[in-house]
Amino acid sequence: MVLDAVGNPQTVLLLGGTSEIGLAICERYLHNSAARIVLACLPDDPRREDAAAAMKQAGARSVELIDFDALDTDSHPKMIEAAFSGGDVDVAIVAFGLLGDAEELWQNQRKAVQIAEINYTAAVSVGVLLAEKMRAQGFGQIIAMSSAAGERVRRANFVYGSTKAGLDGFYLGLSEALREYGVRVLVIRPGQVRTRMSAHLKEAPLTVDKEYVANLAVTASAKGKELVWAPAAFRYVMMVLRHIPRSIFRKLPI
């Protein structure tokens, strides 16, 4: 990667430019060194200017806003070109997505398709484009925000969980495909994180703050890791849940 003298990235791209977790990761990188931050978000997102201001206040060398509509996959090549037009991108964070109402999603075809297109199809679209660019660079780090919900899909939120299962599988495979080209991929599987998106939910065990996820993302990337859980204990929880028979699993209060 194009790093400074002590190994910090010079350019960070955030796909989902107003994502609280994504911005926390950017800010964590800025704690180490000033960097160019590129925020890709909806042109009418009311939080985009505040996000840019927060990055400047956190110490960004410069902040660029580019338009990104996850649903408009035909526009993604042009968006990625714009993101790389100012030079190589060292770190790209894929942190956009919807949660939705779990019970409504499986009973509403339009909303089910929408969340699948945003959480999975769009994530694949930008992943392929990022891989192409970083492969040409010969370096780069992709950080993909997955979810513990995708590791074993539960009845409680199976539409959302299934989209994250797809994203998770794609980026783990992309990690293998890019290994020989000097490009790294980190998949993060958080449980519940305290953000706007989860504010209406009852807090679950092992819930963490976005700053915890951000610190994990930066430190795990620096160590060359490919898959981490947030918190780490979720790895062992999911290890057990993955092997519980369906007849028993469906009776668990999760």
Swiss-Prot record:
EC class (word): oxidoreductase
SUPFAM superfamilies on file: NAD(P)-binding Rossmann-fold domains
Keywords, sorted A to Z: Cell wall biogenesis/degradation, NAD, Oxidoreductase, Periplasm
Catalytic residue positions: Y160 (proton acceptor)
NAD in keyword set: yes
Enzyme Commission (EC) number: 1.1.1.333
GO cellular component: periplasmic space; plasma membrane
CDD domains on file: SDR_c
Disruption phenotype: Traditional knockout mutant with dprE2 disruption could not be achieved, suggesting this gene is essential. Conditional knock-down mutant of dprE2 show that down-regulation of DprE2 results in growth arrest in vitro. Cells lacking this gene display impaired growth.
GO biological process, alphabetically ordered: arabinan biosynthetic process; capsule polysaccharide biosynthetic process; cell wall organization; cell wall polysaccharide biosynthetic process
Database matches in InterPro entries: NAD(P)-bd_dom_sf, Sc_DH/Rdtase_CS, SDR_fam
Any GO MF annotation of the entry: oxidoreductase activity
Ligand binding (NAD(+)): D67, K164
Main subcellular localisation: periplasm
Family assignment from sequence similarity: Belongs to the short-chain dehydrogenases/reductases (SDR) family.
Cross-referenced PANTHER family: 5-KETO-D-GLUCONATE 5-REDUCTASE, DECAPRENYLPHOSPHORYL-2-KETO-BETA-D-ERYTHRO-PENTOSE REDUCTASE
Function description: Component of the DprE1-DprE2 complex that catalyzes the 2-step epimerization of decaprenyl-phospho-ribose (DPR) to decaprenyl-phospho-arabinose (DPA), a key precursor that serves as the arabinose donor required for the synthesis of cell-wall arabinans. DprE1 catalyzes the first step of epimerization, namely FAD-dependent oxidation of the C2' hydroxyl of DPR to yield the keto intermediate decaprenyl-phospho-2'-keto-D-arabinose (DPX).
Other noteworthy facts: Was identified as a high-confidence drug target.
Assembly and interaction partners: Interacts with DprE1 to form an epimerase complex.
Protein name: Decaprenylphosphoryl-2-keto-beta-D-erythro-pentose reductase
Species classification: Bacteria, Bacillati, Actinomycetota, Actinomycetes, Mycobacteriales
